[in-house]
Regions:
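Short, Lys/Arg-enriched N-terminal segments with co-localized hydrophobic residues
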Residues: 4-20
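Cleavable N-terminal signal peptides
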Residues: 28-29, 39
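Bacterial N-terminal signal peptides that target proteins for export
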Residues: 19-28
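Predominantly extracellular/secreted and cell-surface proteins with exposed
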Residues: 96-139
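Acidic, serine/threonine-rich low-complexity disordered tracts
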Residues: 42-98, 130-217
């Protein structure tokens, strides 16, 4: 029953029986219309619909994910407190290009990233790459070590996704750690839904997205 039909039926009943019945029938109308509105809520983005793009968001940031050629994912990040940023991520996980008002950076790997996917629990890989920037000459290479630790689930609103806990460690040419975190990576969406820092310590924290919707909405 759509909204128009409900309205017409209520109007005829009110006209015949007067205002005494209005409160009761308003409650009936809400009972009919509320399930209908819930039914119109869009389904969760899955592996198939993710190919058309989707938006991940949390307070302060909105990220638009668009699959493109070469197994790359184009990501446009819009922030409340800083300028937008554009990224290209291989398989939605490994960053190979970044562009914003603060500069442009390309990460050129020396190995075939396609051989790393699909990721499997227990897999360990080390990637060497060079960072290229128009304003800075590279003095050394950087390494990224990926360790797939296991499977978990992660929720975005009412949508729940199977994710892989992927430990990422970046080191410079001298072997010093530049950054380390655990990415909660969804193979279906080809996107990292969250990052876990200082894992296993009292300072452990999770920085993740909170909602998801199709890009077309």
């Amino acid at each position: 029953m759509n909204v128009c039909h409900v309205y017409l039926r209520l109007h005829l009943i009110w006209k015949k029986r007067g205002s005494v019945m209005k409160s009761a029938f308003i409650g009936m109308a809400l009972a009919v219309l509320l399930p209908a509105s819930v039914a119109f809520a869009g389904p969760c983005v899955d592996a198939k619909s993710a190919k058309n793009g989707f938006i991940l968001a949390r307070p302060g940031i909105k990220s638009e994910f668009r699959p493109v050629a070469g197994e790359m994912t184009s990501v446009t990040n819009t922030y409340e407190s800083q300028s937008p940023q554009k990224q290209f991520l291989f398989a939605g996980l490994i960053e190979v290009f970044r562009d914003s008002d603060t500069g442009r950076l390309a990460m050129i790997p020396f190995s075939d990233l396609r051989k790393l996917f699909p990721l499997k629990t227990g897999a360990r890989s080390t990637i060497e790459f060079v960072e290229l920037s128009p304003d800075k000459q590279p003095k050394a290479t950087t390494t990224l070590t990926l360790v797939v630790k296991g499977k978990e689930t992660f929720s975005l609103g009412d949508c729940k996704y199977n994710v892989l806990a992927v430990n990422e460690t970046f080191k410079n040419g001298a072997g010093e750690t530049l950054d380390a975190f655990t990415a909660l990576y969804s193979p279906d969406l080809q996107a990292a839904l969250a990052r876990r820092y200082d894992e296993g310590t009292s300072a452990q924290s999770v920085n993740g997205y909170e909602t998801i919707k199709p890009l077309s909405e």
